[in-house]
Amino acid sequence: MDDVNTKTAAWADKRWQALLALDFSSRAGRTTLIGKRHQGPLVVQKMLYPEGDEVCHGIIIHPPGGVAGGDQLQLQATLEASARALLTTPGAGKWYKANQLSASQAVRFHLAANSCLEWLPQENILFDGSNVHFSSEIDLAEGAVFCGWDILCFGRQARGERWSEGELRQVMQVRREGRLIWNERLFAQPDSLVMRSGIGLKGMPVNGSLVVAAGTVPVEIIEACRAIEARGDAHYGVTALPEILSARYIGASSEAAKEYFERLWQVLRPWYAARPATRPRIWNT
């Protein structure tokens, strides 16, 4: 027992506590990053403007490349009225074996009136033995718009690795002027019913969700989204609620999931942002 406690303490000493807080403002039709707080290994690159001054693109980087047991990442973004930003990541997030400690990522976004934030990260890969807690809280003022997606890979598929040990806790909540309009929770272990059930993840190694909070979705947009098909062996679909549009992918390929969500984004963005989808340049590398 002493050896176990000693090893746990040693790992605790090495864990990262990372925080990145970003503040965006819109002045004279140009969105700029006006404030940044940074602690630990979580940084943002210089803002890019591939679609003009109104929308700035930011790339969130975690230099260590992977997240070990005990690491805690916090990403916060605050958008002032009418600001518009798109945030993404350069590559897949890697969540390593827990070593008796859980790792976490907490996302907190606050959007003022008529602002728009898109959070479109690459996939997260849960290594065998990982113990991970993801939480996302999005607070929207009147007229604010949020679009975000999340893709999880259970095990390193390219190596034939299965997620046979570990734990996942995932929570996402969206509020409009303090009122809860979306509340999604997932608790999974490799042998839990949710991983193999026909109403759960159906035994598939990749699970993805896309959420848009932008008010009532026009019928023609819903129909166009539902006409999009995901390739390969997959289960997918689009659900329209009074204040939320959500899409789900359950399948065997993270690339197919990203492709499916990007095609949905190409249909949705002209509606909620009044501009065509412009791929972040980092996606082409």
Curated annotation (Swiss-Prot):
One GO MF term attached to the UniProt entry: nickel cation binding
A GO CC term attached to the entry: cytoplasm
InterPro entries, per the entry: UreD
Key words, A-Z: Chaperone, Cytoplasm, Nickel insertion
Keyword ATP-binding set for record: no
Subunit structure: UreD, UreF and UreG form a complex that acts as a GTP-hydrolysis-dependent molecular chaperone, activating the urease apoprotein by helping to assemble the nickel containing metallocenter of UreC. The UreE protein probably delivers the nickel.
HAMAP family recorded: UreD
UniProt function note: Required for maturation of urease via the functional incorporation of the urease nickel metallocenter.
Protein name per UniProt: Urease accessory protein UreD
Organism encoding this protein: Methylobacillus flagellatus (strain ATCC 51484 / DSM 6875 / VKM B-1610 / KT)
